[in-house]
Design a protein with these regions (language model features):
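Alpha-helical transmembrane segments within multi-pass membrane transporters and channels
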Residues: 61-109, 116, 250-255, 259, ...
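Membrane-interfacial amphipathic/re-entrant helices at transmembrane-helix boundaries
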Residues: 1-21, 49, 60-70, 97-101, ...
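Inter-helical junctions in multi-pass inner-membrane proteins, predominant
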Residues: 2-17, 144, 165-170, 196-237, ...
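Hydrophobic alpha-helical transmembrane segments of polytopic membrane proteins
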Residues: 20, 25, 77-79, 232-255, ...
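Transmembrane helix-bundle core of multi-pass membrane transporters
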Residues: 93-94, 99-168, 195-198, 261-264, ...
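Single transmembrane alpha-helix segments in multi-pass membrane proteins
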Residues: 4-53, 85-101, 237-245
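Membrane-embedded helix boundary and interhelical linker motif in transport proteins
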Residues: 31-34, 38-85, 265-273
């Protein structure tokens, strides 16, 4: 039971990070029907920018929490500017093109960002310093670290803020109107191009936060680190219902729990043949099952394909 509860905690932390990235996927898809496969690389850039800032300020005497705040702000600025440029240069000219063209462009952009990051930051993994006290709080068997608590609290604050933004602000109404029908929204005074750019910017900010969380939780960063979390976050978005914000949140948490619990018991289930490093299999088995049994996702609705 203790092992199970520990994996629940680990799964909630992992799922929180997946949820933040999945929200970026689902927001963009909900508005322009694009799967932005370069989104995982925004997480990677956020992590590497955070590492750069923390390394540069390591000798200034700033406390760890202050370094984390500065690194987070810098990561958000860089990632939002980068994603804004990606949308403006790579995706906007293809908005009315056949769907295969933007999809291929997104894959190409993913590889381009990985390559540029490898050139700028070099291919070797870099240790991310411990910024918060390495205190493990005993919960009567399972333990949780200060960093994990911060990840959970920050994630739920961000998710609550995002739901408020989408449901109770002028920008949120414009986003929902654009998602429903960009042409009609334009006739009502909404500027679809501005709304779409804002959606990419918000998604990038969420990915930047997730990038810093990932680096702080796992203690290492490198140019290729965004691919697998990005792919799993996409799986989470599909699991919950692509285009549905609540579905992305639920999908992230569910996927994190599946992966963590699976990793904790994989060795026992296979008689020691497979170790926890094979845990990635659970995410993709979940994706296959969802696409087979419920393609619309847990909270998704069956809708007619838009022309």
């Amino acid at each position: 039971m203790e092992t199970f509860l520990q994996q629940i905690i680990n799964g909630l932390v992992l799922g929180s990070m997946y949820a933040l990235v999945a929200l970026g996927y689902t927001m963009v898809y909900g508005i322009i029907n694009l799967i932005n496969f370069a989104h995982g690389e925004i997480l990677m850039v956020g992590a590497l920018v955070s590492w750069t800032v923390v390394s540069a300020l390591a000798d200034t005497g700033l406390p760890g929490w202050a370094l984390m705040v500065v690194a987070l702000l810098c990561a958000i600025v860089v990632c939002t500017l980068l994603n804004f440029a990606v949308e403006r240069i790579a995706y906007r000219p293809l908005r009315n093109a056949p769907r295969l063209a933007p999809l291929i462009t997104a894959m190409g952009m993913s590889l381009l960002l990985q390559t540029l990051a490898m050139i700028v930051w070099k291919p070797n993994p870099k240790p991310f310093p411990l910024l918060l006290p390495s205190v493990a709080i005993d919960l009567g068997g399972p333990v949780i670290t200060v960093t994990q608590i911060l990840i959970l609290v920050l994630t739920f604050i961000i998710l609550g803020g995002l739901l408020f933004l989408v449901n109770h602000t002028k920008l949120g109404r414009a986003m929902r109107a654009t998602a429903e029908n960009p042409r009609v929204a334009g006739l009502m005074g909404v500027k679809p191009d501005v709304v779409i750019s804002a959606t990419f910017v918000i998604g990038a900010a969420l990915a930047a936060v997730a990038g810093l969380m990932w680096a702080a939780n796992y203690g290492t960063v490198q140019h290729s680190m965004g691919f697998m979390p990005g792919l799993k976050a996409f799986t989470a978005a599909v699991l919950g219902g692509i285009g549905n914000l609540a579905g992305a949140m639920l999908g992230g948490v569910v996927l994190g729990l599946i992966e963590a619990i699976g990793a904790g018991y994989l060795g026992d289930l296979t008689g020691g043949v497979l170790g926890s490093h094979y845990a990635d299999i659970f995410a993709f088995v979940a994706l296959i099952l969802v696409l087979t049994l419920r393609p619309s996702g847990l909270l998704g609705e069956r809708v007619a394909d838009r022309a």
